[in-house]
Amino acid sequence: MKRVDIVNAIYSACDEDARLTKSRNGQLESITTMRYIHALLPERAKVLEVGAGTGRYSVALAREGYDVSAVELVERNLEKLRENAKGLENLSATQGDATNLGAFPDDAFDAVLALGPMYHLYAPGDWNRALDEAIRVTKPGGLIFTAFLSVYAILYTNYLSGNFREGLAENFDGDFRVRHFEEQGFTGFDISEFEALFDGKPVREIALAGTDSVLVLAKQMNGFSLPDEEFEAFVRYHLHTCEIRELLGSHSHLLHICRKQDGRTNR
């Protein structure tokens, strides 16, 4: 199957619109991501979200008054995004791929959010094309927010229920080097491996944070519950500790934030 077919199949079988609102791990991921966006995004910024899904972030930012362009690969998600964005004249949504943002000129946006594409890009060429395109369309001094998955969290959240050998073989080779291939659906990275993708690019890392802690794993426990007051306390703890390097691999979702320096990337 082609990558686009794999991604379409994944999101045709799940409710992406509800993921960030109805589960504690999704809520924490959203809270954390928006905290960093609000802390760093200038007023009246022009924002591009690549892999916008159903518009959770694009719609929220447009409602706050930002000028938002959203690009989404999956037709089903795009339809829901447009439905969610009704009445928002400062949000435009188009279908497209993170590896080719040719519809947008160089240095066009104050910030680019790529909060999903790296989950479904499996080859170094595609990783570099997606990152280079995000950097290209960002203004010098602008911000690039890129989400990715921890390969270690994938292993212990998805494969501790009796199929650990399968998960080990799928995510690591015999020498425990991380594997990436399309049939994974979701691909994870070692943190240092992901940071190295930016080597030689005209950017400076300014933050690396985990966004959902261990809640993806915790919710699989029988009887797991996090009532509102307990969740509020956990959020306070999480926001204080989410950049601690030793804890990053325990998060399922991570957020890399960098600032574009002078100079341009090639298309």
Predicted regions and their residues:
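A short SAM/SAH-binding and catalytic strip from SAM-dependent methyltransferases
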Residues: 111-125
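A C-terminal cap/extension of S-adenosyl-L-methionine-dependent methyltransferases
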Residues: 207-267
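A short glycine-rich, Lys/Arg-flanked "PGG" loop and its adjoining helix->strand segment in the class I
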Residues: 128-140
